[in-house]
Regions:
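A feature for loop-to-transmembrane-helix boundaries and adjacent hydrophobic helices
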Residues: 1-203
Length: 203
């Protein structure tokens, strides 16, 4: 049984808190950027840079908006400017994903290519980024697994029940970050019909 001392704040600089979740998002985008720049030959360097910049912007804005409206709407009502207080923490994965998709859709229109053409070329390199984000979920004590009595179960300090749970975030980090990555590389080795690769990713 593991009892981790998980502090969501990695570095505290006065009033500025640098959180593990934010660092894992940074690691995610850095890894995806490197992989796309190194291995995706259908996008030039400028396109890859634009893709990463606007995707990161979409992730931050979408992630923050998703967190506020789904988990902290009372805070927004009392202080609408709190939506910009990113340093206080609070990013929603699903909101961030939606923000990235909107950014990619806008870029596809700007480049004169079809949305799923772009998605097919990006999707194989996204899984490692998902793995990093799941590690951030673990550090934040989010998405807790089911209670268990296995030897590698985890008691999260923030869990009000205080029971041993599956470290589901780590399972997802392995499944989404490694297994899915290898699978996506396998199916993307040969030319596929449009949306075939991104369709497999969504499934």
């Amino acid at each position: 049984m593991l009892i981790p001392e998980l502090d969501p704040v990695a570095i505290q600089l006065g009033p500025l808190a640098i959180r593990w979740y934010g660092l894992t998002w940074l690691a995610a985008f850095s890894t995806i950027y490197f992989l796309i720049k190194r291995y995706q030959k259908d996008l030039n360097v400028e396109q890859v840079s634009d893709l990463m910049f606007y995707s990161l912007l979409g992730a931050i804005l979408g992630g923050r908006a998703g967190y506020i409206f789904f988990y902290s709407i009372e805070q927004f009502i009392s202080n609408p400017l709190s939506i910009f207080f990113i340093w206080q923490g609070g990013l929603s994965f699903h909101g961030g994903l939606l923000g990235v998709l909107i950014a990619c859709f806008w870029l596809s229109k700007s480049w004169g290519v079809q949305f799923f053409w772009l998605m097919d070329r990006v999707a194989p390199f996204v899984p490692p980024g998902l793995g990093f984000v799941r590690l951030g979920n673990f550090m934040n004590s989010e998405l807790l697994g089911r209670p268990t009595d296995i030897s590698w179960g985890v008691i999260f300090p923030s869990d009000p029940l205080g029971v041993t749970r599956h470290p589901s975030q780590l399972y997802q980090a392995f499944g989404e970050g490694i297994v899915l990555f290898l699978y996506m590389l396998l199916i993307s080795r040969n030319s596929k019909p449009k949306m075939n690769i991104s369709g497999h990713f969504l499934l």
